[in-house]
Amino acid sequence: MGSVQDPPAASTPTSTPQKFSTSLTDYSSAHAASSGPYADNLDVDALIVGAGFAGIFMLKSLRDRGLRTVIFEAGNDTGGTWRWNCYPGAAVDSEVPEYEFSWPEVYETWNWKSNYPTYQELREYFDHVDRVIGVKKDCAFNTVVVGAAFDTRSGKWSAAKRWIPPWPGLDKYRGIIHHSSFWPDSEIDVRDKRCAVIGTGASGVQITQAWGPIASSLKVFQRTPNLALPMRRRPLSTEEQIRSKRFYPELFRYRETSFAGFLYDWAEKNTFDDSAAEREDTYEKAWNEGGFHFWVSIYKDNLFNPEANKESYKFWCKKVRSRIGDPALREKLAPKKMPHYFGVKRPCLETNYYEQFNRETVGLVDIKENPISHFSERGIVLQDGTEHEVDVVAVATGFDVVTGVMTQLGLTSIEGTALEQEWAPGAQTYLGLTVSGYPNMFHIYGAHGPTLLSNGPTAVAVQGRWIADAIAKIEANGVKYINPKKEASEKWKKRVVELNDKTLFPSTTSTYMGGTIPGKAYEPVCYSGGLPTYAKEIREALDNWEEGFDVVRDAAKL
């Protein structure tokens, strides 16, 4: 279904580390060695971009069906996010066994150390997956896709890969600075260092917890308070996991029946069906369970009814404010007036985040009232001229999620248009799996799928099986390619918007509404109808594929 060609010669890569890497190509070029065994002049049935959960799931699924399949990975190893995200304190926010492959040959020979694995343990897990099913033999590492086009005559994609030379310039700042998504593998010693964390999303929270106890001083630059939830991490014994694995097949089936792909689901009643005392008990139980229980296992109207949502926020506020000593900080970190509806931004999980601000060495800088202006040689300068001198900066401001993954690949449609320009006014997909004008191209955990409103491995399994079945149907029916119809894509977009409009998500800027990237369309990017409904709808579309796709037969196979 595709081939790989070399682009024009690029500058010779160097192994010199980047001072401040901000893209996949920056990180990839910082790793030397070869571009992998499959990088050049390749003709395969399927090319997969990325060697994380989704890529590995697709590799095994398609290989099991006899298809020649390889992965192009920008990094230097498998693991996807967990090869990039190695900042201090990085850990997953889904619990074991929700966050793992459902293949018996993998889980029966693996035991976790805790119920919320760190990035180090997740790297070990992906190495284990490779040993069991053989991933790396079909991977080209340090290989960045920068362009791809489809030939309607041959029914194949041609993809281009290249190296990018190191960042040519350095800014004025003389200290150490790294983005959380491109953290160096080597540890940064922050003892006796003045440190700063810019951003209070998941990575900002985790870095703050890691640096707070050891840095000489730490300043956390906050625009919006993080409505974080308790993680409740605990060790897992081998004996406990051996007992649990008897139920894994049932648990893996169940996670696909819950709204968000976790091993728990909404209560079958609304907030005000209960008395105030009963609500308190429900909230308390979910809070003590930890993880996302307080987000997606309380009342079913919590993300839909403003008054119901205020009740959950009041409980959250009471719990968190009791942990913060300073009254002024208490109001900044857990304000009585909610900054936005609870849960319309994906909550982060924390262990002792709020307690860090009880330390004399940890402070909060409000950059909503006084934004960052620029960096100086010594540190961070705010709009009013205040300069914060720091030795180490962690930039935890997030990245262009969901749609950015697709638009950075240099994809060209059969009409000759670039996906990046097509999606500038807003993303257009069919089923959250395909894009009109890009035949035989499928995406997982991206725009208009459950994605950020779901547990990653669960969504990957639902979408990955669909893609494998779609490709099998193409092969079995003598089809050259399928191309989503524009009217079907428009109908799917309308469906995504209508579902989202029933929720509280449109009330604030968040990753669910396109993120905070300047100039990016403000629109829903995730399917908010729940994983079971989504799975049913995409299956019906595959059964009746000629309603949503132009199905082009291969004359040579008829």
Label each region the model flagged:
Residues D192-K193, P335:
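Short, surface-exposed connector motifs at secondary-structure boundaries
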Residues P184-I188, C195-I198:
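A conserved hydrophobic secondary-structure block that centers on an alpha-helix together
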Residues W163, R174-I177:
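Lumenal/extracellular "mature" regions of secretory-pathway glycan-modifying transferases
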Residues S180-F182:
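Active-site glycine-rich loop that binds ribose-phosphate moieties when present
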Residues R194-A215:
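Rossmann-like NAD(P)H-binding beta-loop-alpha module
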Residues G55-I56, G204:
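N-terminal Rossmann-fold NAD(P) dinucleotide-binding loop
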Residues G2-A46, A51-A54, S61-L170, S186, ...:
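N-terminal FAD-binding dinucleotide-binding subdomain shared by FAD-dependent oxidases/monooxygenases
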